[in-house]
Amino acid sequence: MASTAPHPFRIANFRAYWLSRFSGTIAVSAMSIVIGWQVYNLARETMDVKEAAFMLGMIGFAQFVPLFLLTPITGLVADSVDRRWIVRGTTTLLVATAALLWYLTWAGSLTLPALFLAAVAFGVARAFSGPAYSALAPNLVPRESLPTAIAVSSIAWQVGTIAGPSVGGLLYAIHPEVAYGIATLLFAVALVFMFLIGPVPQPPAQKDRRPLIRILEGFRYVRQNRLVLATITLDLFAVLLAGATSLLPVYARDILHVGPQGLGLLAAGMGIGAAATAIWFSFKPMSTNVGVKMLRAVVIFGLAILTFGIATPVTAALGLHRETIGGIDLHPAFLLSMAALVVAGGADMVSVYVRQSLIQLHTPDAMRGRVSAVSQLTISASNELGDFESGVMASILGPVGAVVFGGVGATVITLAWARLFPELGAARTFDPPEILETEPQHGEAKP
């Protein structure tokens, strides 16, 4: 990257974008941890551990269905409609959803069906906002500043994932409706900052093209670009198998016995590692051997998830038990679990950084929305469908067996991808072949 590239925070529109994403991420993370805890607690009133864990998987599936059905369309929308207004509309939906959950909790009438409906609303909002958010960032900064913009944008997301779960767990311990009330306020703040983003360049109009053809072009582009295909599918299968976050309420309540506060810390663990890595990349952008570093990072991610899964039996086998020394509660299994999640988060951030940089820099702006939609579809499949997979496997193997299976599976998948896609290992830098640009990449739109 050129040394003269301006830092993204020097650009007013990007600052507003960053603050909007930061506020929204804290709110989403706080609500996700509270919803997961409430679903598991309500389910445990009438179900055993395996059955309740399956309900956590179903929450992930409820979010995946609208994402799966809508994402191909939302990519086209992101390439056809002002991306700022897409995010404004979806954030309004999130404000309404958080406010409704606050009311139901306050009234004492919150039920599992209501929580599942909230998960569906989350899925709809994310289906539209994901491609719009991703495709908007390159319009706010010069091309040479984009890798740094991706890194600092990831900081907003990762710091939000640190603060959100911790805040959500602590506020839930005070009272559940307090957590939902704060989430509603934070979504409103995110909406205000999105309205502060001024005019930005829009993709060129393509009214002469049939919508179905334009939708399929996004999938065709990904299929033909093997490097982009490799990065997207590696994340899909690795996280699909090793996504253990949906089972954190099970670990917090029935394995580690640390309650909602401990759940908040566990959920923040991956964010801590990811945020530290993103901060490093914002000052020291990766520039060499990017493909090999991504492959190594995903292997480390799988091994870290495996370590998290076996932390409790390993510490028990070593004779390390929970005890209080000098007024400090020492919980070896919890500490090892936290350390493993921090490492997993840092490794995952390396993968995210490489994947997003390659996708954004290897895609012309007129197609970024559709390609970002394809990327989001795979991300949602790996995350939400991965939650469902974790719930199903936990109902069969138990929660520990499900996490161990996922960690081993992610490692094996990465080794296989290194052989199937030699283009990924051969990628030395982010620099793409010459891409035909059809519009300016940054600056203010002319009135």
What are these regions (language model features)?
Residues M1-R15, V200-T233, T324-I328, E437-K446:
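Juxtamembrane intracellular "pre-TM" segments in multi-pass secondary transporters
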Residues A2-V65, R220-M270:
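Helix-loop boundary and gating motifs at the non-cytosolic
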Residues G24, Q63, F122, S153-G160, ...:
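Structural signature of transmembrane alpha-helices in multi-pass secondary transporters
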Residues I33, Q158-G169, S246, A278, ...:
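Glycine/proline-centered helix-kink
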Residues A107-A114, W157-M194:
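Helix-loop-helix hairpin linking two adjacent transmembrane segments in secondary transporters
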